[in-house]
Amino acid sequence: MERVTHNLEFENAHIMFPNFRGLPTKFDPVGGKRTFCVAIPDPDLAQQMRDEGWNVRVLAPRNEDDLPLDYMQVKVAFGDIPPKIIMIANGVQTLLDETDIGQLDTAEIQSVDLVIRPYNWNIHGDTGVAAYLKAMYVTIEMDRFAIKYEQREAPRRRQPEKDDGDLPF
């Protein structure tokens, strides 16, 4: 299998099973692995990705009227080169890091644009391509009260004058 070097881009992506906090799960009982899954709505693209070695899975339909859905798990690693994650809420962009990315687990996500980078692995002759988040732009839906009571930067307090050690009494 040829080495995959191209990034994947998903505009207006549908993400599922978010675990940005890295909480323990059935598949990661110890926890610490931050992941989410991205839907791949185009069956031809999903097959091409499988052929390249990406780990594309199929989610069985819940209802008989539904179709199976191709998807892929994406890892979120904050190492030497952390992903660029921008949260947009009420037009304000906030850069998220490993300390605050967990808020996306419960956020009402309006839209997501993703860039996923490949990691080609080879373990004892078995090969494949793991998906790692490179960049993500997440627009969050805010309710009208969140907008109304949105935190503004508080005015800075005056710093007390230097104390020379003498008490005023």
PLM ranges: what are they?
Residues 91-112, 119-130:
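Exposed beta-sheet edge/beta-hairpin loop segments within beta-rich domains
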Residues 1-82:
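OB-fold ssDNA-binding interfaces and closely related basic DNA-contact patches used
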Residues 1-4, 142-169:
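Acidic, gly/ser/pro-rich intrinsically disordered tails
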Residues 37-39, 115-117, 137:
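Residue-level recognition of well-ordered beta-strand positions that form the cores
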Residues 41, 79, 117-121, 141:
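Beta-hairpin (beta-strand-turn-beta-strand) motif
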Residues 123-144:
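OB-fold/S1-family single-stranded nucleic acid-binding modules
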Residues 73-82, 87-101:
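A beta-strand/beta-hairpin structural motif
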